[in-house]
Amino acid sequence: MKPLTGNYDPKKIEDEIISFWEENKIYNKLRDIVSKRREKFLFIDGPPYPSSPTPHIGTIWNKVIKDCILRYERLLGKKVHDQPGYDTHGLPIEVATERLLGILNKQEIIDKIGVENFINKCKEFALSNATKMTQNFKDVGVFMDWERPYYTLDPSYISSSWSVIKKAYEKGMLDKGTAVLHWCPRCETTLSDYEVSEYRDLEDPSIYVKFKIKGEENRYLLIWTTTPWTIPSNVFVMVNKDYDYADVEVNGEVLVLAKDRIEAVMKEASITNYKVLRTYKGSELIGVKYKHPLRDFVSAQTKLDDFHQVVDAGNVVTLTDGTGLVHAATGHGEEDFLIGQKYGFPVVMFVNDRGEFTEEGGKYKGLKVRDASKVIINDLKSKNALFFEGKIVHRYPVCWRCKTPLVLRAIDQWFIRVTKIKDEMLKEIENVNWIPDWGKSRISNMVKELRDWVISRQRFWGTPLPIWICEKCNNVIVVGSREDLESIAIDSVPNDLHRPWIDNVRVKCNKCGGVAKRIADVADVWFDSGVAFFASLGKDWQEKWKELGPVDLVLEGHDQLRGWFFSLLRSGLILLDKAPYVSVLVHGFMLDEQGREMHKSLGNYVEPSVVIQRYGRDILRLWLLRNTTWEDARFSWRALELTKRDLQIIWNTYVFASMYMNLDNFEPVKYTLDDVIKYAKIEDLWILSRFNSMLKKVNESMKNYKVHEMANYLINFLVEDVSRFYIRLIRKRAWIEANTQDKIAMYYILYFILKQWIILASTIIPFISEKIYKSFVVNPKESVSMESSINYDERFIDNELERAFEVAREINEASLNARAKAGIKLRWPLAKVYIFVEDEDTLAKVNRIKDVLLSLLNAKDIEISKIEGFKSFSKYKVEPNRSIIGKEYKSMSPKILDYIRNNSDIIAIDILNKKQHVARIDNVDVILNTSHVIISEETIEGYVSSKFAQGIVVISKEISESEEEEGLVRDIIRRIQFMRKQLKLNVVDYIEISIKAPEERVKTIQKWEEFIKSETRGNKVILGDPKGDIVMDWDIEGESYIIGIKKST
């Protein structure tokens, strides 16, 4: 054991330990040790997205939680699979690469850059950022297999991933269909429902349009829309046949709208002069035909004349806004599309992939749809079809990556019909351990609203869909791996399975023998990470899954319940018919001090590197891990400062232990717990019990991966129980020169606890733990990470003793409070402390720890008795309730008040014991109870008291001459100990002390000389002119003392 010295210096320690880990390849050696174990722990890393080289502090939190759990499972002796991963495909990478290359749209990738070059640039960007992120994660002590990460761009990963799509095809779940989906006109690709998660407040037109009813002179259907650009694609109008509608005359025209919407519509249009001609059911409108207002500008509309009619759409039509008549554009609205399919209407869409009107859009050809809205409104005016034009600010969906407003388009896409397995998914959710429990209800609610999975994307940088279509017979061929493809390929299969190389691979049709070509689409990026549970295992994943599966734990932020956790579940059900994971842990988001999300644009973002530079890695890790895992955390510099104090206390604890154990040449290898336990004092047995109780709680918490509970249990134990309580109790025993049996027992128990604590704490604060472990532990392994964690020992848990010490803490707090009232410093010993307790159980506890209390309270004697004994130190104070007495007794009130003033004790005793007191005043029985008086108990003159939960502590205000002398001497000792620290003396160093004191205090110092020497490790005390290596003036209780000390030679 090497003694630790000095203050806690995070930067120095952490730089030293990082070098130690790297130079000695500690993780690689640990990996080799772990790989030989039997009991598996399969962890799959939720792959972060390398769109930036620097991870967000929330991502650091995520990785530190993972690291903590993996370290803990290794300490338990498990074969831990700790491969990190990166999610490297998708739009964010494409958009970032486009910016770097100065590309404005998708077509420029093809025309200016070339797909092959673009793919290489995307790959380069993703891998470069992933490499930099890896360094950031390693820098905060994350022990994962960074030499062997999985990347979703790896050919082997892509090849393995195809097995899910093939399995879906074999189950009849994969097909192509038309659906109205959100589309990004800038990225030129579709987005699934769960990708439509970002909204912006946009201002749009809010217009009411008149559709002229055929065969009637002046009657119009009145519709409302905030997307004028969809009117050129209008096919029909929807109503609810059961609603009440009305013909309303306005300015000589008859408008048809829902009865319940008349008032709101007219108010919005500022029309006060209108007349309701008649009302009728919506069923009367069914089949009514109308003339499209823009048919002169959109010639394609003339082909739709037969479909321009009113249909019943049931509850699709609402009365919360609009007119109760809804214009339907089958190519631009999901409900419009479904109702249109029901009635056999065509799907009409005049908008291309770039969000521009096509040739069929007539006058609006080439216009962006949102730009076209202004032109369309003017054309409606010119045709007398615009009833009212306003503006609306509403939440509108934008592309989650490029922030372009989305449009709805009817398009052909490839679907996996996951609605077929919805019931199975819900059943599997019940079999998973969700931490916390609300995770289950959230993902269940999402699955209950499940829609079929749109798996195709019209982009370049992604997993190519393994779907080939025969040019001759349209047969669909789906491959499940590279090997599958090679067995039927006409052309050689490239090493890189990305576009454009894979696009050149033709296959032979297994039906007609013709040539099949791959479809141009890539997979939804959520497909990539959703297959990580097996695709990350490599080419031979089937064999590895048999050995390692299922996944023991996945953990990510709570947003991933609808993201990655759901994607894994979906892929697991398709491929394996079951959930791929056993437990799911959810963590919160990192917010600023006001509870806002942290963004550079808000100016509230804090770089992890800034925190590390100011406080260090362990302080950041500990603060992160102590936050309740599944709750959002608020960043706080103040909290980091308090965390630093805790680590300083931890460091000081090991400095104390290592110093004194070295001083006494203590050799822990000579002993065992069973050897020393019989010599242990009650405080030693208590700290051993507290340690095992703490281990037991940690064990229980970590069954459900509650790292915040483990972190708090560990830190609170060492800071509160060991440092602030136990060491305070044993400090005098450590100063004793002789190695008595009880001192050896104390040392061994403290060593045993501190060794095991630092091993377990390495899961949370690995840098300081490694440093302390290497110095403090006798015969250590090469690294603390190679250690094993012990289980708690029920033999050493004494709950009654722990409860007794809790009472001791409370008594100590009460005693400190009483000292403060009396103005008596803690260093001044008390001649006697009186402790009065309420019950026999507490009496027994306090008597058991009387010796501990003597030390703790700095008292010469303690008297313990039942609460009744407090009466000899107390008196009752009775205050009359004047308003009640006045109302009840009127003119007798003054005499009753005099009576109360002169008989307070007997009144109080009677009311407390009998609930009332009867007073005879002027021959009248006056009954007094708690409504007439307020009773309180006061301590008698010369004493002060303070309550604790189970009783009262009483001390005298006066201190004797001897006690005052001892208090003064202790104040002198405190100054000398401070001066020792200033000289940076070792605890084993002796000193010579010289003191110049007031003349009347010289005899006191002479009297207490031996005590001063024993407490300060002094070998000489000289009274006179001070001299030495350091001389300081001190004011002690208004008196001047000059003290000098020097190191003895």
Swiss-Prot record:
It is found in: Cytoplasm. Monomer. One of its GO terms (cellular component) is cytosol. GO terms for molecular function: aminoacyl-tRNA deacylase activity; ATP binding; isoleucine-tRNA ligase activity; tRNA binding; zinc ion binding. It catalyses: tRNA(Ile) + L-isoleucine + ATP = L-isoleucyl-tRNA(Ile) + AMP + diphosphate. GO terms for biological process: isoleucyl-tRNA aminoacylation. ATP binds at K600. It comes from Saccharolobus islandicus (strain M.14.25 / Kamchatka #1) (Sulfolobus islandicus). It is an enzyme of class 6 (ligase). This is Isoleucine--tRNA ligase. PANTHER family: ISOLEUCINE--TRNA LIGASE, MITOCHONDRIAL (PTHR42765:SF1), SOLEUCYL-TRNA SYNTHETASE (PTHR42765). Its EC number is 6.1.1.5. Its cofactor is Zn(2+). Catalyzes the attachment of isoleucine to tRNA(Ile). As IleRS can inadvertently accommodate and process structurally similar amino acids such as valine, to avoid such errors it has two additional distinct tRNA(Ile)-dependent editing activities. One activity is designated as 'pretransfer' editing and involves the hydrolysis of activated Val-AMP. The other activity is designated 'posttransfer' editing and involves deacylation of mischarged Val-tRNA(Ile). A motif ('HIGH' region) lies at residues 48-59. CDD domains: Anticodon_Ia_Ile_ABEc, IleRS_core. SUPFAM superfamilies: Anticodon-binding domain of a subclass of class I aminoacyl-tRNA synthetases, Nucleotidylyl transferase, ValRS/IleRS/LeuRS editing domain.
